[in-house]
């Protein structure tokens, strides 16, 4: 039987683009581990993706995961859009390169053999874990230490 793990994630950006951060909580049998990191120049969508990636990459074995995010971009991207992006060689329906493709590929790899249920929660609506992740993400964004090497400014 697979371990049942809960993951809660959020991303934040002070300006978009601007300094950003992510926050994630990984919970297993009442034990929690938190993750957060700040980046000097990034976007909110990249930080939402990073939160999910870092938490999933922390799992050491195959798990049954319930991952809660307030990002429709992440939830829809991974449950709906990614299949066609991959079929089209990481291009959109308009034949344009998928934005944040470096992180989408990393998230796709992080899914591994996990069984994942993606849950959308309304942000800033009093969901306790989402609020904690938001606090972690905003604190990280206010004290960025990393460079987001994959961020590409819009042309």
Swiss-Prot record:
Report the superkingdom from the record.
Bacteria
Q: How is the cofactor bound?
A: Binds 1 Mg(2+) ion per subunit. May bind a second metal ion at a regulatory site, or after substrate binding.
- Where do the annotations place Mg(2+) 2 binding? 10, 134
Q: Which Gene3D superfamilies match?
A: Ribonuclease H-like superfamily/Ribonuclease H
Give the binding site residues for Mg(2+) 1. Answer: 10, 48, 70
> Matching Pfam families, A to Z?
RNase_H (PF00075)
Q: What is its EC number?
A: 3.1.26.4
Q: Which reaction does it catalyse?
A: Endonucleolytic cleavage to 5'-phosphomonoester
Enzyme class, broadest EC rank: hydrolase
Domain RNase H type-1, first and last residues per copy = 1-142
Identify the keywords attached in UniProt to this record, alphabetized. Cytoplasm, Endonuclease, Hydrolase, Magnesium, Metal-binding, Nuclease
> Which cofactors does this gene product need?
Mg(2+)
Per the record, what is one GO cellular component? cytoplasm
The family database entries (PROSITE patterns) matched by this protein are listed as: RNASE_H_1
Task: Name its GO BP terms in alphabetical order.
Answer: DNA replication, removal of RNA primer
Similarity comment:
Belongs to the RNase H family.
Subunit-level organization: Monomer.
What this protein is reported to do is described as: Endonuclease that specifically degrades the RNA of RNA-DNA hybrids.
Task: Tell me the HAMAP family matching this sequence.
Answer: RNase_H
Name of protein: Ribonuclease H
Q: Which organism is it from?
A: Salmonella arizonae (strain ATCC BAA-731 / CDC346-86 / RSK2980)
């Amino acid at each position: 039987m697979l371990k049942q793990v809960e993951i809660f994630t959020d991303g934040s950006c002070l300006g978009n683009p601007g300094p950003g951060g992510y926050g994630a909580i990984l919970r297993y049998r009442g034990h929690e581990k938190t993750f957060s990191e700040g980046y000097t120049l990034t976007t909110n969508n990249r930080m939402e993706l990073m939160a999910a990636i870092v938490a999933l990459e922390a799992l050491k074995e195959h798990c049954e995961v319930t991952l809660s995010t307030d990002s429709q971009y992440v939830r829809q991207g991974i449950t709906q859009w990614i299949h066609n992006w991959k079929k089209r060689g990481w291009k959109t329906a308009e034949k344009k390169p998928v934005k944040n493709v470096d992180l989408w590929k990393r998230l796709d790899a992080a899914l591994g053999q996990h069984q994942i249920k993606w849950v959308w929660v309304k942000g800033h609506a009093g969901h306790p874990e989402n609020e904690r992740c938001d606090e972690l993400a905003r604190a990280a964004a206010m004290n960025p230490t990393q460079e987001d090497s994959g961020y590409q400014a819009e042309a």
